[in-house]
């Protein structure tokens, strides 16, 4: 599985093929290709197999964990037992989040928003739960959701925004584009064409970044948006780029903990500062 840029490691305490079966799900394809056991089973001990050095741990990268409420208390207990680490949860079921509020202090909680319907759900439920860091993952971004960020002020209810395209096999993406997403563009990510992505429209991404900057909210652009960001007008360079060759990949300051996060390039100061202000994280491996 490709590296997820905004985390250090992944851990999956619930094994098996995710029942959500989203059409763009990379995890189901991995299970099918490797002929892994699709049965659902609980393996909480994976959350004890962690590095000594504080790091960011994405919990449930291949599974919708909120489908299994009977196992969540044990998962959160494991998180509390490792306060040196930051545990990241991401869900497409925001309606379930208030049931588990408040979340442990070392947990970040995100909601996946791919289209307007998902944005509507996020708008309603994100204010109803408590977490040290809340964020939106607009990945894959399949529609223009700016009206929810602006008119409904959703952007000010979170501490960070991730934006990305849909990466996968060319054949599968071509079919999805034809049947569901004709407004998106198919591009190869590498010279030999092994990796492809469906790119959102540049104007969608630009409006989201502008709304986030106006609110002082950090923006993390996934690497699969590199080609899209190359097409921006010269005057919009700073919207997309950290420097001449590095995409903006920012995290909220408080997501770094006392030790800081060494594997990510930068974090953003609080919204009381200039919205584009950045501070470099500490040294280390």
Where in this protein do the model-derived segments appear?
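A structural motif corresponding to the C-terminal end of an alpha-helix
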Residues: 78-85, 128-132, 204-218
């Amino acid at each position: 599985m490709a590296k997820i840029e905004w985390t250090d490691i992944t851990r999956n305490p619930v094994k098996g093929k995710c029942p959500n079966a989203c059409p763009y799900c990379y995890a189901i394809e991995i299970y099918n290709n490797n002929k892994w056991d699709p049965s659902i089973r609980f393996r909480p001990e994976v959350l004890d197999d962690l590095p000594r050095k504080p790091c960011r741990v994405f919990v449930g990268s291949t599974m919708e964990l909120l489908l299994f409420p009977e196992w969540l208390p044990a998962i959160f207990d494991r998180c509390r037992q490792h306060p040196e680490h930051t545990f990241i949860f991401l869900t497409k079921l925001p309606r379930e989040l208030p049931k588990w509020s408040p979340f442990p202090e070392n947990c970040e909680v995100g909601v996946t928003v791919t289209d307007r319907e998902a944005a509507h759900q996020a708008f309603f439920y994100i204010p109803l739960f408590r977490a040290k860091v809340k964020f939106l993952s607009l990945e894959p971004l399949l529609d223009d959701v700016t009206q929810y960020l602006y008119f409904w002020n959703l952007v000010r209810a979170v501490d960070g925004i991730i934006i990305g395209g849909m990466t996968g096999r060319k054949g599968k993406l071509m079919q999805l584009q034809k049947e569901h997403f004709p407004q998106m563009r198919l591009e190869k990510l590498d010279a030999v064409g092994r990796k492809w992505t469906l790119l959102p429209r540049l104007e969608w991404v630009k409006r989201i970044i502008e709304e986030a900057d106006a609110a002082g909210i950090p923006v993390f652009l996934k690497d699969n948006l590199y080609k899209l960001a190359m097409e921006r007008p010269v005057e919009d360079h700073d919207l997309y780029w950290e420097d001449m060759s590095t995409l903006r990949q920012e995290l909220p300051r408080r997501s770094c903990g006392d030790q800081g996060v060494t594997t990510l390039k930068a974090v953003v100061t609080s919204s009381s500062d200039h919205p584009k202000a950045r501070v470099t994280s500490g040294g280390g491996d």
